[in-house]
């Protein structure tokens, strides 16, 4: 039995709360059980310098954790002078995931930055950030369309993410911290609403894993993503 008493294919309770940041063009507070991530989308009326004059825009992301998002306080990375390798990896992952479903030509020469701030961490912060960031991006684009900045919503599809793992020899969905810290294998899947893969990360932690186990985790992830995409649709309806 899992520490949370959930079935192998069961998500934690997930909620989306939109428009939680007064000044951001789009915002969403997403909760995966006890993991809470605030995602805000900010519009800049110019693209990155290296993109200027090319007639298209850009979507990027930044990721951070509040010092007391975890059991013990973590120093703010701003005090060390640069983000950690983990932080850089995660924010690049979030940006890639969102660009995979965005028509950058449809943005025009503009940039949207998604800030994902972890308020409370209990495993799966990067996957929660991606799933909530899509809602914040959607609402930013909707804000732009309402003001005739863009004509059409330049989103090709939904995108969401979920963690899986092998725990006590069993493939399971949506690991919390207690499960993740003891899992033999840890994996993250980013999948579009139409079922295409954006990114797969899988790492043997305590023991190697088989192709059969990877396939089982992918099947669990697909089921979880289907549920999350339906929740996204309901949230922005």
From Swiss-Prot:
- For this protein, the Enzyme Commission number is 2.7.7.56
InterPro entries for this protein:
ExoRNase_PH_dom1, ExoRNase_PH_dom2, ExoRNase_PH_dom2_sf, PNPase/RNase_PH_dom_sf, Ribosomal_Su5_D2-typ_SF, RNase_PH, RNase_PH_bac-type, RNase_PH_CS
Which Gene3D superfamilies does the UniProt record give? GHMP Kinase, N-terminal domain (3.30.230.70)
User: Which keywords describe this protein according to UniProt?
Assistant: Nucleotidyltransferase, RNA-binding, rRNA processing, Transferase, tRNA processing, tRNA-binding
GO terms (molecular function) for this protein are: 3'-5'-RNA exonuclease activity; tRNA binding; tRNA nucleotidyltransferase activity
Q: Where does phosphate bind?
A: 86, 124-126
User: What CDD domains does this protein's entry cite?
Assistant: RNase_PH_bact (cd11362)
Matching entries from NCBIfam families are given as: RNasePH
Q: What is this protein called?
A: Ribonuclease PH
Organism this protein belongs to: Methylocella silvestris (strain DSM 15510 / CIP 108128 / LMG 27833 / NCIMB 13906 / BL2)
Gene name in the database record: rph
């Amino acid at each position: 039995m899992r520490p949370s008493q959930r079935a192998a294919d069961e998500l934690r309770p997930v909620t989306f709360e939109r428009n939680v940041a007064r000044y951001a063009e789009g915002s969403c507070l997403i909760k995966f059980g006890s993991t809470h991530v605030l995602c805000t989308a900010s519009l800049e009326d110019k693209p990155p310098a290296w993109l200027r004059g090319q007639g298209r825009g850009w979507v990027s992301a930044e990721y951070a954790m509040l010092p007391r998002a975890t059991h013990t306080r973590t120093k703010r990375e701003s005090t060390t002078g640069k983000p950690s390798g983990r932080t850089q990896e995660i924010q690049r992952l979030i940006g890639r995931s969102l660009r995979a479903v965005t028509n950058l030509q449809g943005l025009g020469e503009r940039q949207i930055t998604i800030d994902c701030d972890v308020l409370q961490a209990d495993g799966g912060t990067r996957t929660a950030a991606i799933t909530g960031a899509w809602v914040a991006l959607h609402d930013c684009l909707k804000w732009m369309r309402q003001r005739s900045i863009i004509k059409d919503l330049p989103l090709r599809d939904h995108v969401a993410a979920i963690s899986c793992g092998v725990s006590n020899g069993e493939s399971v969905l949506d690991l919390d911290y207690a499960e993740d810290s003891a899992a033999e294998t840890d994996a993250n899947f980013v999948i579009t609403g139409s079922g295409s893969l954006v990114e797969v990360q899988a790492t043997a932690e305590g023991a190697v894993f088989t192709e059969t186990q990877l396939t089982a985790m992918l099947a669990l992830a697909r089921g979880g993503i289907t549920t999350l995409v339906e929740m996204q649709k309901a949230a922005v309806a």
